[in-house]
A protein has these predicted regions:
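Rhodanese-like catalytic fold shared by cysteine-dependent sulfurtransferases
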Residues: 3-6, 17-40, 50, 59-90, ...
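A solvent-exposed beta-alpha-beta segment
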Residues: 44
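Sec-dependent N-terminal signal peptides
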Residues: 6-12
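Structural scaffold elements adjacent to functional motifs in cytosolic proteins
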Residues: 52-54
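Short, surface-exposed ligand- or partner-binding patches at beta-edge/loop junctions that are enriched
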Residues: 95
Length: 132
């Protein structure tokens, strides 16, 4: 009986630890719907408070992207962190096509100490006014 209790408590501690580690990596990532992103982009004062990173591939970005965004693909984001490190304490919005790559990019940014990450609806999920 004592052995089963020890095993159970050990398992419980591992679960609690893994959940708390996972929560830390995502607590700084906030979902943002497309209408909120468009409102920010259309307001000159608000727009200056955010860095918008399109994490799609270059050819996807060139085909059409939200205004005022920069392109750093999800594959490159870790190696190009130094280019955006001034934004660690500021608002960073990541966007892609469907939300999968932007979520990955957001997690990478949190891992590198970024505090305020917004994961916006992808360009296939919201009817953004794209520019080329």
């Amino acid at each position: 009986m004592m052995k089963k209790t020890c095993i159970f408590l050990s398992f419980l501690l591992m679960v609690i630890f893994s959940v708390s580690c996972n929560a830390k990596s995502t607590e700084n990532i906030i979902r943002m719907d497309g209408s909120r992103l468009e409102a920010i982009l259309n307001d000159e004062t608000e727009r200056g408070k955010y860095l918008v990173i399109d994490v799609r591939e270059d050819y996807e970005y060139k085909a059409g992207h939200v205004p005022y965004s920069i392109n750093i693909s999800v594959q490159e984001i870790e190696s190009r962190i130094s280019e955006i490190s001034d934004w660690k304490e500021k608002n960073v919005i990541v966007i892609c096509r469907s939300g999968r790559r932007s979520r990955t990019a957001a997690e990478i940014l949190v891992k590198h100490g970024f505090k305020k990450i917004f994961d916006a609806d992808g360009v296939s999920k919201y009817n953004y006014k794209l520019e080329k």
